[in-house]
Amino acid sequence: MKSVITISASLAISLMLCCTAQANDHKILGVIAMPRNETNDLALKLPVCRIVKRIQLSTDHGDLQLSGASVYFKATRSASQTLNIPSEIKEGQTTDWININSDNDNKRCVSKITFSGHTVNSSDMATLKIIGDD
């Protein structure tokens, strides 16, 4: 009897943890190494086109200076959206959520995200991590 109760409790806890993990749909979409010189063609291509409603940016190994970002959607006319991003991200910092797909058409999927910017205050290249929420 005691083992039945233990197994039941374990299953219940596992089910709660499972459902909690599914509720958080945040995924690392990719990481870009940012060069030390200003570059305007840094692209994160998503191998599988996915619906992404918002993104967060974070950095490691140095500070970043960003001058622009755009999202490209898989569509017949290659639609895109310019993102409103912070101009600087310090090492270890994560931005607030940046909304995308805000044009009443939440069915479009993201095929690529491009960035313009460079590493500052570091001899190593900083890494820009892109986190998506669908």
Swiss-Prot record:
Signal peptide (residue range): 1-23
Transmembrane segments: none
Entry keywords, A to Z: Signal
Entry's family note: Belongs to the UPF0412 family.
The protein's name in its UniProt record: UPF0412 protein YaaI
Organism: Escherichia coli O127:H6 (strain E2348/69 / EPEC)
Gene from which the chain derives: yaaI
